[in-house]
């Protein structure tokens, strides 16, 4: 019996300002900062790729997340896979998922992908300058699993 593949969209939650990014990269930094400053590197290289339908959206806005889910369904996407950050109990860029958990919408399937690496200044060609370090311990693993269980017990995850 063949199972039908379900397309899942990777969802980077870096599209709203945070105090950490303000400190590390400058006031108001989001991933849009990098998108807008992209430049062509060779003939025929189209840059920057500016956003279309939703513009330079802000993931703090619930209507944006609702529209993204609607667009995803229209284009045959079956779920979102949100990048999830956990640094010894510190979560960052968690607001979109937390607001979805609280509000129960958009009513669209999702999963989490643990972005399990140090945050560094690699963009600035300083990969050894660690901003947030990944450390591992049994105690922290248990806390992380407990948090994840609260997410996985929802109907749409």
Predicted regions: what is each one?
Residues 1-157:
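Glycan-processing catalytic domains of CAZymes
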């Amino acid at each position: 019996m063949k199972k039908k593949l379900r397309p899942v969209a990777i969802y980077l939650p870096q599209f709203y300002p945070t105090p950490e990014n303000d400190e590390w990269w400058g006031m108001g930094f989001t991933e849009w900062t990098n998108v807008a400053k992209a430049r062509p590197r060779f003939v025929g290289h189209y840059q920057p790729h500016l956003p279309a339908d939703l513009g330079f959206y802000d993931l703090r806005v619930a209507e944006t997340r609702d529209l993204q889910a609607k667009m995803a369904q229209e284009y045959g996407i079956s779920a979102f896979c949100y990048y999830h950050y956990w640094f010894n109990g510190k979560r960052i860029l968690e607001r979109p998922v937390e607001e979805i958990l609280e509000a129960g919408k958009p009513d669209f399937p999702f999963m989490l992908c643990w972005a399990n690496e140090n945050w560094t200044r690699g963009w600035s060609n300083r990969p050894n300058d660690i901003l947030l370090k990944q450390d591992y311990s049994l105690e922290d693993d248990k806390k992380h699993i407990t948090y994840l269980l609260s997410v996985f017990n929802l109907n749409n995850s």
